[in-house]
Amino acid sequence: MVNLLFLFFIMSFFPNNIFDYDQQAITDLLITASLKILFALAILLIGFWLSKRLQKLIIRALRKSNLEPTFISFAGNISYYLLLVVFFVLCLAQLGIQTSSLVALLGASTLAIGLALQGSLANVAGGILLVLFNYFRVGERIEVAGIEGIVESIEILSTTICTYDNRLVTIPNKQIIENNIINHVGKPERRIDLVIGVGYEEDIDHVRSSLQWVIDQNSEVCTEPAPTIALGELGDSSVNFYVRPWVKSEDYFRLKLQLTEAIKRKLDEENISIPFPQRDVHLIQPETKELDIKAA
């Protein structure tokens, strides 16, 4: 079967009136066909080699730019297959096969596939944008599309986030690009915002010095920018102080809890009251009227 197919393939290089040729003419045609096949194979082999070489060069160059490994691998594979398609078309042209119809067929197929997979292609485009513009990296804390957690992986079609309660959430890249992205560790430092309410009867300077003592005792609080401790507002039931220290972004959640607890302990130690809203309810009893009931 294979021999017959090969024979038909060789016969395609000959004209329809092959049997009218003499032996020398047939020999010349066979040599010409063999040379075309050899040149086509050479083009194909060179194409494989150059495609692989170009893939390695692109991957090596992209690794120096600190891009995500997922994008580097994707770019390398795309360059490899695109160049391979070019050499395959050249190989067919060398064999005398009309490539214009083949290119048109490939174009139509690409269009049909694109229309069928437009959602997936949008996710691919989103993945490329995420990596190129470096909105976030693997291991960073982000919040997007109502999901908050640590980035586990950035793939071509989707991004996986591990929430704080250890759930894995996979979000399509198209949805990420179309929503606001909050990167909690995008900057080296981050500010903790605490509102501490104390009673109106408390001495303001005493409260401020107590809060400052708590901040000074924590060596992980940044000295630059300097922390802010100020009377922020007079509330309905408390005097509210704004406590705003700066910490390393990766320590934000842990230090926020530590400082909140330390402030509560210090205020208790200094007998500084922390009021809470109270509501007094006054009941007004209506006056009762005596009714004369007369017997009928």
From Swiss-Prot:
Membrane topology: Multi-pass membrane protein
InterPro entries for the chain: LSM_dom_sf, MS_channel_1st, MS_channel_C, MSC_TM_helix, MscS_archaea/bacteria_type, MscS_beta-dom_sf, MscS_channel_2nd, MscS_channel_C_sf
GO CC annotations, alphabetized: plasma membrane
Keyword hit for Cell membrane: yes
Compartmental location: Cell membrane
Pfam families listed in its UniProt record: MS_channel_1st, MS_channel_1st_1, MS_channel_2nd, MS_channel_3rd
One term of GO molecular function: mechanosensitive monoatomic ion channel activity
Key words of the record: Cell membrane, Membrane, Transmembrane, Transmembrane helix
Keyword Membrane recorded: yes
Membrane-crossing segments per the record: 1-21, 30-50, 71-91, 92-112, 113-133, 142-162
Domain of life: Bacteria
Family per similarity comment: Belongs to the MscS (TC 1.A.23) family.
Protein's name in the database: Uncharacterized MscS family protein slr0639
Organism ancestry: Bacteria, Bacillati, Cyanobacteriota, Cyanophyceae, Synechococcales
